[in-house]
């Protein structure tokens, strides 16, 4: 993760904070858009009906998710993604959608 992105956003931070940083148009926005493009490129290589798994870590996931779903209610997504959590993105003829994948609260772990 480039230092200017981490300096602008920090981690762990709630999705609302991350979305505000992306909206500001600085280093976090550029990185988020690059991440979203990369994920979309990977999805474009998957055959119809297929799936891909992308494994990443803190802040990469949040930034890419915000940029992939810019019209979502990011504040409703809550806190940062923890270990073994993520987002399921769907790219199809109807557009793009996503669902956060969370562990039960008692099993969540977020450390930096």
Where do the model's predicted regions map?
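Phosphate-handling substructures
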Residues: 1-38
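Beta-strand elements within well-structured catalytic alpha/beta cores of enzymes
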Residues: 46-56, 60
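Acidic, low-complexity terminal tails and accessory targeting/binding regions
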Residues: 2-9, 48-50, 63-112
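Aromatic-acidic/polar surface patches that form glycan- and anion
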Residues: 28-32, 54, 79
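N-terminal start-of-chain detector that recognizes signal peptides
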Residues: 24-27, 59-63
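Short, well-ordered alpha-helical segments in soluble proteins
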Residues: 19-22, 43-46, 68, 72
């Amino acid at each position: 993760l480039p230092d200017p992105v981490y300096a602008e956003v920090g981690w762990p931070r709630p999705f609302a904070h991350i979305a505000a940083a992306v909206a500001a148009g600085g280093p976090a926005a550029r990185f988020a858009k690059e991440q979203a493009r990369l994920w979309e490129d990977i999805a474009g290589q998957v055959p119809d009906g297929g799936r891909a798994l992308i494994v990443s870590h803190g802040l990469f996931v949040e930034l890419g998710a915000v940029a992939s779903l810019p019209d979502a209610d990011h504040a409703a997504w809550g806190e940062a993604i923890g270990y073994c959590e993520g987002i399921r993105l769907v790219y199809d003829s109807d557009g793009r959608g996503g669902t956060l994948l969370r562990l039960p609260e008692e099993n969540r772990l977020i450390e930096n």
